Amino acid sequence: MRKKEDKYDFRAVGLAIKEARMKRGLTREQVGTMIEIDPRYLTNIENKGQHPSTQVLYDLVSLLHVSIDEF
């Protein structure tokens, strides 16, 4: 039986994404359209710390110029 692994707390990264988006004056709808995700998915990433797929994380940090090195 496998042990349940501790999951990374993604809330700090989500907050950094939200701050970068707002700094650039972009709405969730605009970002969602740009990277082809539902704005509700972005809301969950930003506010609830939902873990995005690797591709979505890459798209967000590339678009918004967020460095994830500090996390």
Q: Each predicted region: which residue ranges?
A:
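Residue-level marker of alpha-helix boundaries and capping positions
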Residues: Y8, E19, E29, N47-K48
